[in-house]
């Protein structure tokens, strides 16, 4: 399954657009394990806890996007976009949304 942020795939013409596919992944962030995460964020450092949660959420959202495209018998998902949200005021979770267009290639 090809995943691309572009609307076309070089050398691979699109035969059919199958529709929009989307997925999401929610990850809890345990700042107890990374007590200084907020201080690092404040002073411009990197939070390993947040980076790890974002990476995992993005990977899970991508895999779910592929699974939904396979259900449509797609060969690829083009125009993929990721959006990140932290709905908790305390920063206790991160949500990654992935959307794209499932396509069948020639």
UniProtKB/Swiss-Prot annotation:
Q: Which Pfam families match?
A: YbjQ_1
Q: Which InterPro entries match?
A: UPF0145_dom_sf, UPF0145_YbjQ-like
Indicate the family of this protein.
Belongs to the UPF0145 family.
What HAMAP family does this protein's entry cite? Answer: UPF0145
| Name of this protein | UPF0145 protein PputW619_2377
The organism of origin for this protein: Pseudomonas putida (strain W619)
């Amino acid at each position: 399954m090809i995943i691309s942020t572009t609307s076309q795939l070089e050398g691979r013409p699109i035969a059919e657009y199958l529709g929009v596919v989307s997925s999401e992944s929610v990850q809890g962030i345990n700042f107890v394990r990374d007590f200084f995460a907020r201080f690092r964020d404040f002073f411009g450092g990197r939070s390993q806890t947040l980076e790890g949660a974002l990476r995992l959420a993005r990977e899970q959202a991508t895999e779910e996007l592929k699974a939904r495209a396979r259900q449509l018998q797609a060969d690829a998902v083009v125009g993929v976009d990721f959006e990140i949200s932290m709905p908790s005021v305390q920063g206790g979770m991160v949500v990654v949304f992935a959307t794209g267009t499932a396509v069948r290639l020639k």
